[in-house]
Amino acid sequence: RRWGLPIPVFYCKDCGKPICTDETIKAVSDLFAEKGSNAWFDMDAADILPKGFTCPHCGKNAGFTKEEDTLDGWFDSGSTHFASMKKDQGFWPATMYLEGLDQYRGWFQSSLLTAVGAFGQGAPFKECVTHGWTVDGEGKAMHKSLGNGVDPADVFNENGADILRLWAASADYHADVRCSKEIFKQLSQNYLKFRNTCKFMLDNLVDFDPEKLTKPEDMPVLDRWLLTKLNELIEKAEQSYCDYEFHIITHAVNDFCVNTLSSFYLDIVKDRLYCEGAESATRRSAQTALYLTLHTLSKLFAPILAFTCDEIWLAMPHTGDDDARNVVLNEMNKPFTAYALDSETMARWEHIIAVRTVVNGALEEARA
């Protein structure tokens, strides 16, 4: 027999014409529902067709044969939208189809053709997203003979699942995606920077009550500067998620942790956190800024670093509005507009940061 989805067509032994009517299709459909498509190859045409069936062309009942050819495999995959979404669940059309670059004339096209042909309702997907191929660190295709493949299980065992997720999200998948131990090593460093930055914030929120946030008017301008930068990150991440530009999010979060937090804000605010009175207004203000930042980062990065962000979420303090069971059970934070500084004030801070960078560079040079 030929392997594949059978073509439900019969032929009249008398006139030789093909037969495919509503009546024959229903008979085949009922048979498949009961016994599966293999029944087509196991049963004779007379056992499939209704009793007393006659040829719609010549009107005779001289016997019938079945079509032995099968449908192209793309018809199978192109029909999955009906079986998986439209028939039972009612989720048709899909939010997104995701596949490799070669599927424009493959799965995407066959799905479109079957949907339009069967229902006349347009594409079975709202959007389709394509990606390049996974290659080694030098851009070469992976082959066992070359020994340049990377086993995901090895990445799990050496670095954890979040590192593999970070690799997938960090790459611009519109082009070929490089994969090597060196790349995972660099990503592990980025991951540790994110984790250690969040750990620092967690350590300094041990005695903080998130129900008692410092009001914007009582907050030092430096803390409001941080939250304004956080607002920018929220807006960029939200747009990037909507556009499926995950690499923009990973790079933006890394830049925020390295430059905005570690190299600037946290370096300055340590004195307030460590040296001022536990209940001092300026210390509580810094804790408010840290809490809102950590609260946002754990949600914002959870789709990528799922396990790490949930670990952070379980360890941090919460308000009654949070679902403390798991970070993904909560909605993403919106920008904290009440704390935002105006553009003129932010521009002045950019000048301050630029001067600080020059001075720090001169100090490092003098120490050398």
For each of these PLM feature ranges, what is it?
Residues 1-208, 226-269, 273, 288-301:
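Structured secondary-structure scaffolds
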Residues 10-13, 64, 208-235, 267-368:
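Acidic, turn-prone loop/beta-hairpin segments
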